[in-house]
Amino acid sequence: MAEASVDIGTQPVTVKKKKSLSIEEKIDIINAVESGKKKAEIAAEYGIKKNSLSSIMKNKDKVLEAFESLRFDPKRKRLRTAFYTDLEEALMRWYRIAQCLNVPVNGPMLRLKANDFAQKLGHNDFKCSNGWLDRFKSRYGLVFRAQPVEATGISIDPSTVWYQNVLPYYLNDYHPKNVFNVKETGLLYRMLPTNTFAFKGETCSVGKLCKDRITLALGTNMDGSEKLPLLIIGKNRAPRCFKGIKSLPVYYEANRTAWMTAAIFEQWMQKLDEKFQAQKRRVVIFVDSCPAHPEVKNLKSIELAFFPSCLSSGFAAMNQGVIKSLKIKYRHCLIKKFLSSVESSKEFTFSLLDAVDTLHLCWRAVTPETIVKSYEEAGFRSPKGENDTANADAAVALDLTAHAVGAGVEFLEGLSIEEYAALDEDLETCEATQKDDAEWAGESKQDETGLYTSDEEEEDSGALEVDLPSPSKKDALSAVGTLKRFLRSHDLNDELHGSLADLENFINALSPK
């Protein structure tokens, strides 16, 4: 009995090793299941148990995401992610761009760039050790080899390389609703057709020549479903027309040049980041490479993607029709307000607050079709849209132009509404060169001591601004009543009815003044 026990105990025990599958193999299994093939046959083909196959299907979304976004080497067998996810994404993005531009990358370069990104992203405790670098290379299947030097004599256009090899990575990683482009443009917000000649071709590089200039920063997503709130940068931190104003439909900032600065851009991105965090979204925002657009630390929901400096700013989607549409609509409204004053024999007044309200109104009127077409013109993939709404804007404005001329408004000979809207397109919107810390500190100190433009300087002798008393609660309710009586004589949808009711309820809830 004892001998039998010893014999059994000494017999070799065979333990079947659990088979590990690569991500590519898991993708093949998922495709086979979804094509209708029997699960038993699939399990037998790949040498796995049925419960392992069920586990793969349960984690299908994770496997597909890892494969489609190229976050992992397809030969890898585990999907364990890193602690510094944002750092790894930035580093891989940089590595892919370097590959596309035929820039050889080695371990020391990657370590240097990893530490650089860590500082920019706020990971001050991170140090790129050999162990971390080896694990990173393993996760993404990176192998550094000597790059052969080939003198082909063929010049490569960096912009073509970027569009063909870099942009697709972003568009693969993000849904069109989460792909944004942001762009600045200058605006002479009081410029009428009667005084266009003085501004034609003006760059306003020092911010002193044009008293009525502002900078707009605007952005939309790729499918045209979302427009970011406008950012307006003026010269006066607290203009007289803003007195008593507690809220605006836009973001408003100011400095003495009415330019975008690194500080304003950083604050704006942080506000937008909070908004997208609340929506539990992850977005990419494309911006020009310039001193006013720095890397912004600690963004959790926004990835900033910088157009390479070799690309002209004209390639930005906003420059392909969105800005044009907004400005045509704005000039259209400005002329209408001017005509109303002329025909009623009243002095024309138009303040910065009027400009803010008009811009907000016109921004809401820019159509999704215009936005989608602009992205297509900029080289971004998008469903085809054939509506040329920018031209439609111009066509609508032709009748107004004829009306204006008939009322005695002088247009420059041959000046179209499109040319009128584009006269300020050359205005500079940011500092051309990077300032050092001492210069920025000095400028901030000067601004704090009152070097913002004063009301007197901005008003142009007061001819185009007027102080209006703040209406009472009773006045506001009376105005809502007048609006309701007017709208009842027109077809009104449920949404507008609801908006009117919400407006009246909001006013009623305010304390009487």
Curated annotation (Swiss-Prot):
Gene this protein is translated from: Tigd4
Protein name: Tigger transposable element-derived protein 4
Entries under InterPro entries matching the protein: CenT-Element_Derived (IPR050863), DDE_SF_endonuclease_dom (IPR004875), Homeodomain-like_sf (IPR009057), HTH_CenpB_DNA-bd_dom (IPR006600), HTH_Psq (IPR007889)
Domain HTH psq-type: 12-63
Organism: Mus musculus
Family to which this protein belongs: Belongs to the tigger transposable element derived protein family.
Binding region for DNA: 39-59, 108-139
Gene3D superfamilies listed in its UniProt record: Homeodomain-like
Region feature Disordered, mapped onto this chain: 433-473
